């Protein structure tokens, strides 16, 4: 089974976990979405479509929107919509995961800071990013 997690932004973080029998491996990275406005939307959609076709995940999880910074919300919605539109057009399903749900799963509370999340991921699964 392959699970792809995506944190959509102009610097999109991603992690692909592969589980085979009782073993698992992972790869992760950051994809910088170049351009502005519609140019960036087209690039984002195409990048994710190509990534998904080359890695064929069984499950795609996209982090939902965070509303903390109103100055970046428009860009985040553009990128997130491009990803969701691309997955829909290509016939891939996905799950939206609110940021607070992810934080609560990893740290036990939905308001954890990024540094705390990274530390808890390492403590629980011995993986660092």
Language-model segments: residues:
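Phosphate- and other anionic-substrate recognition elements at nucleic-acid/protein interfaces
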Residues: 1-129
